[in-house]
Structure formats: C-alpha cells, structure tokens
A protein has these predicted regions:
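Catalytic pocket of metal/acid-base enzymes, prominently hydrolases
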Residues: 1-108, 126-179
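Short catalytic-loop micro-motif centered on adjacent basic/acidic residues
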Residues: 77-82, 106, 184-189, 214-217
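Acidic-and-aromatic substrate-binding clefts and catalytic sites of carbohydrate-active enzymes
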Residues: 82-88, 113, 193-195
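Distinct, well-ordered alpha-helical segments
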Residues: 90-95, 116-121, 195-207
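Hydrophobic, small-residue-rich alpha-helical packing segments that form membrane-like cores
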Residues: 113-115, 132
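Short acidic/histidine-rich active-site segments
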Residues: 143-146, 183-193
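C-terminal active-site-proximal or functional interface alpha/beta core segments in diverse enzymes
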Residues: 71, 207-217
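Long, K/E/R/D-enriched contiguous segments that form extended
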Residues: 174-180, 192-197
Length: 217
C-alpha cells in the first residue's frame, strides 16, 4: 500500500525501534500467534520513524521539483499538501522565492505547538502561490489496512473495529482553535464511526460560528 497508513519493516529495524507493545493508541503492531509480522499500522509506525534518517532540505526540494514537473505535464497547476510541519513552511517559501516552486499550493498544518504559534501570529496566510489556512487531523486509518474506524467489526477481521488515530478531546480542541483563528479544520475520516464522531464535533463547533467551512476528507 502507498497511503501512509501502514509500513512493513524488517527484523533489524523492528529490534532497533525496541517495539514491545502489540497495540498502541491509534495504531497496531500486527502479530500471528503472538509473533510480530513486521506490519505496523498508523500510529505504530511512529516507533520506527524516529530510527530512519531524515531527508535533507536539498533532497526534499529535488523531489518537489520532480513532482511539480510531472504534474505540469498533465496540466495540473495546483495541489493540496495534506499535513506539513513548521519547517516545511520555510522550505516552500524558499523555493517560491527562487522561482523553483510555481504550483498553487494549499498547505494544511499538522497540529503542533509550532504550527499553532504560526497560525496565531499570522492568521490565514498567503505568500505568493502558497496558501496556509487550515489544520489537518487524522480521525482514523484506511479501509485497506483495516484502520478505518467502523461501527461494526470488519467482515474478515471480526475482532477489529479499526483505529481512532486522534482522540475526540484533541479533535474538539483543534476545532475550537481553528474557529478562533479563522482556519479550516480538514479531517481525514473514512469509517462510518469516525465520520459520526467528526460530524458531532463539527456540529458543536458550528453552534459558535455556523459560517465556517470545515471539511471531511
């Protein structure tokens, strides 16, 4: 799968990460007869992400330039980036200033302290073709990896209803923060249970400000 909701790691990396829990909040370490398979779902991937070397700024810029060129070949001139860290804002601005990033880019912020500080300082933000006015939240995982949060168990995995990646408390907090800052809240929601939770959170937020454009994606 190429969707950011599952990872398959070898024994060396598994041992380096010192994974001991079979399940974590919003994630799962898949096992067969109590033996880890190396398949990590959603938040369980955080165990190994810290062990991997980070891409350099130049590597990221090169990758973005290559992707941009391919998009232009298909006539696509704008895109959304669903979840960026604070460091990426500076990187995007640098590429725009040097003329290397020409795509219209609607970037969503991950819910971090640095990104919240940015939103409070700047409000809805635009730098030439870069637009920042939303926060990205993940309520659940994907159907294919059995991470989407369902009201009923999966038909081929009866013990599982899926995963709640972000607590209801945190999602409520983000919704009120976004209302205050004039930002959108863009929530990943696949399963019926996850969507029900998101709609309840949005309904409560819209009582305070009904003229707001949150979305589920």
């Amino acid at each position: 799968r190429v969707d950011g909701h599952a990872a398959l790691v070898n024994k060396f990396l598994f041992d380096q990460a010192k994974i001991v829990a079979s399940n974590v909040d919003g994630g799962e370490v898949k096992q067969i007869n109590g033996v880890p398979t190396g398949l990590l779902l959603d938040n369980a991937m955080n165990f190994v992400s810290k062990q991997l070397p980070a891409y350099s700024s130049n590597q990221v810029k090169t990758a973005i330039a290559e992707i941009q060129e391919e998009l232009f070949q298909y006539g696509i001139t704008g895109t959304h980036e669903a979840g960026i860290d604070f460091k990426h804002i500076k990187l995007f601005k640098s590429m725009i200033s040097s003329g290397k990033l020409k795509l219209e880019l609607y970037a969503m912020l991950m819910n971090s302290a640095e990104n919240r500080t940015f939103a409070m300082k700047h409000g809805p933000y635009r730098f030439q073709n870069l637009y920042i006015r939303s926060f990205k939240v993940f309520a659940d995982g994907s159907l294919g990896s059995r991470g989407a949060l369902l009201k009923k168990p999966y038909s081929d995995e009866h013990q599982s209803h899926g995963l709640l990646l972000t607590s209801v408390k945190e999602m409520r907090d983000v919704s009120l923060f976004c209302l205050k800052q004039g930002y959108q809240m863009n929530t990943h929601g696949i399963g019926d249970s996850a969507n029900s939770l998101i709609l309840d959170i949005y309904k409560n937020a819209f009582k305070r400000n009904p003229d707001h454009r949150f979305r589920i994606e």
